[in-house]
A protein has these predicted regions:
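Extended, folded cores of ATP/NTP-driven motor/assembly subunits in large transport
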Residues: 1-388, 394-399
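Glycine-rich phosphate-binding loop of nucleotide-binding enzymes
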Residues: 16, 35-37, 42-44, 50-57, ...
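Switch/coupling segment of Walker-type NTPase motor domains
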Residues: 36, 43, 68-94, 456-515
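Amphipathic, soluble alpha/beta structural segments
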Residues: 147-201, 403, 427-467, 473-480
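Core mixed alpha/beta domains of very large multi-subunit molecular machines
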Residues: 377-422, 430
Length: 515
């Protein structure tokens, strides 16, 4: 079965697939930055599992959720902002040198693909209610229908903020520009090589998704390779053929924390009608009971107990059933590197409690799964390899993973993270007159580099302050002071000296309540 790629339009901060009428679908995306829990206590992992279960419970009948995860994000916008602040603020030669070195080094690493930034987006998709137009349809009724859907998406956004914001996560509703950029990057993996300063210049809201973003066809690969060739890259697809037999919080990190870039995960999720599922399971239980009465096989007895437990679990509301489709796509410039990525991904899937990955050998099947993973499009007519799974199990295998970046967008200083990422920091947070100082304590053994770290922060943030005062023991910052200002002289206070720091000095003023 061959399925053609879907098409739609960007507008009013939503995506409309196949028209705003009966048979069409409407979706909106949300960028989610969850708290980084890779090394967190199990208590926090369990809390995230509960939050994700609540997220699934919020899905309405006939609505679908698509989880889009990838690790091919770029740090270029943040680096350009950092560079702009250097040009605007830095006047000291040492500060300029330090900040420029950080910019050039990290820019080169980003271009070489050695930096890694995970991105997570949630798309909520629902069918267009054609009956809402009534017997006549006009511009006013279309605007009213769009307004109703936008309000529903707004409520979903508030729900997501309440769900993940309390744990330190961030949620941002995507705009037309965000939807366009996601599709442009998704369908054009070579975009970062073209050195385009502003991709939004190519956005035309009058054109469809394919006209805006789909600039080439998929060409089949020669055997024994599987997948297809598109936009200068070889693409390979993996789909979970069997899901993990059991799960645990954090099991998805086996897939999301691999040490290479250029692969993504798409999970399409649909709620299941519980009553219909119970009726179906009851019929199957009756059939198995009849087989057991005639054959008396232990295997049939175990199947009876499993189905009876499932019926009881759903009837009591202890869990809720969902159907999911789990798609993994990898791409690379060479076939050899793509094969290596697919092998590593298969091994990671196998480590997820005996899950199995299916690699479609037919180019048609690979393309169909690719079309099923387009952002926001979770109603594909290609229905292969959907699985029934309970809510807690679905929650555990969702790729809810993020890259810790700190205050990257308005960073005063930058450091490299442990997972090929950049972490930004600020000395004050807030807006306007509501700035709050961010106090810090640096801990480490002797020779671990505490002073080196602090000097780097001082060097990068010098341009934000009129002067810097350092009170320390041992003279570790004398070289830094002389480098920033050759005329600076340290004030040395010692036990047998003539200077002291009297914090009780009123400077000749009478005592007051402030003292």
């Amino acid at each position: 079965m061959r399925v053609e790629p879907t098409d739609g339009f960007f507008g009013e901060n939503v995506i409309v697939f196949e028209g705003l009428h009966r048979g069409g679908f409407i979706t909106r995306g949300f960028e989610v930055t969850p708290s980084d829990l890779e090394n967190a206590d199990p208590v926090h992992h369990n809390a995230l599992e509960s939050d994700l279960t609540a997220l699934l419970a919020g899905l309405k009948p006939n609505h679908r959720l698509q989880v889009q995860w990838d690790n091919s994000g770029t740090f270029r916008p943040a680096l350009l902002k950092f560079r702009g602040a250097t040009v605007e603020r830095a006047t000291n030669p040492w500060t300029q040198r330090v900040r420029n070195e950080i910019f050039v080094r990290n820019w080169g690493m980003d271009e070489a693909g050695r930096l890694r930034r995970e991105r997570l987006r949630l798309y909520f998709t629902m069918p267009v209610d054609g009956d809402a137009f009534g017997p006549t349809r006009g511009r006013a009724s279309t605007a009213a229908l769009l307004s109703a859907y936008q309000e529903e998406f707004h409520q979903i956004g508030l729900f997501l903020e309440a769900l993940f914001g309390s744990a330190g996560g961030r949620v941002r509703a995507m705009t037309d520009a965000d939807h366009f950029l996601h599709y442009l990057e998704f369908l054009n993996p070579s975009l970062h090589e073209r050195k385009i300063s502003d991709p939004l210049e190519f956005f035309d809201p009058e054109k469809s998704i394919q006209e805006n973003c789909w600039h080439g066809e998929c060409r089949p690969l020669e055997k024994p390779d599987t997948g297809f060739y598109h936009d200068g890259y070889y693409h390979g697809m993996l789909v979970l053929k069997s899901l993990p037999k059991r799960t645990r919080p954090g099991i998805a990190y086996l897939l999301t924390k691999l040490g290479f870039r250029d692969y993504g995960i798409t999970v399409n999720i649909e709620p299941v009608d519980v009553e219909r599922l119970i009726d179906r399971e009851q019929k199957e239980l009756t059939r198995v009971e009849g087989d057991y009465e005639s054959l008396r096989k232990i295997k049939l007895l175990a199947a009876m107990k499993t189905k009876a437990a499932k019926i009881a679990r759903y009837s009591n509301g202890d869990s809720s059933p969902y159907r999911i489709q789990y798609i993994i796509r990898a791409w690379d410039k060479t076939r050899e590197d793509l094969r290596a990525k697919l092998t590593a991904l298969k091994a990671a899937v196998g480590n997820m409690e005996r899950a199995q990955a299916y690699e479609p050998a037919l180019e048609t099947s690979a393309r169909n799964f690719f079309y099923s993973s387009w952002p926001g499009w979770s109603f594909s007519r290609y229905t292969a390899l959907w699985h029934d799974y309970d809510d807690a199990l679905v929650a555990n295998i969702l790729p809810f993973s993020s890259t810790p970046v700190g205050h990257l967008e308005d960073a005063e200083f930058l450091f490299e993270g442990a997972n090929g990422n950049l972490v930004g920091g600020r000395t004050f947070c807030g807006e306007g007159n509501s700035l709050t100082p961010q106090n810090a304590v640096v801990l480490g053994t002797t020779g671990a580099g505490k002073s080196v770290l602090t000097i780097s922060i001082l060097s990068q943030t010098e341009c934000y302050y009129g002067f810097t005062m350092i009170a320390e023991e041992g003279g570790a910052y004398n070289v830094y002071g002389k480098t920033v200002d050759p005329h600076a002289e340290p004030i040395v206070i010692q036990a047998n000296g003539k200077l002291t720091m009297n914090y009780l000095d009123t400077r000749g003023l009478p005592l007051s309540g402030l003292h």
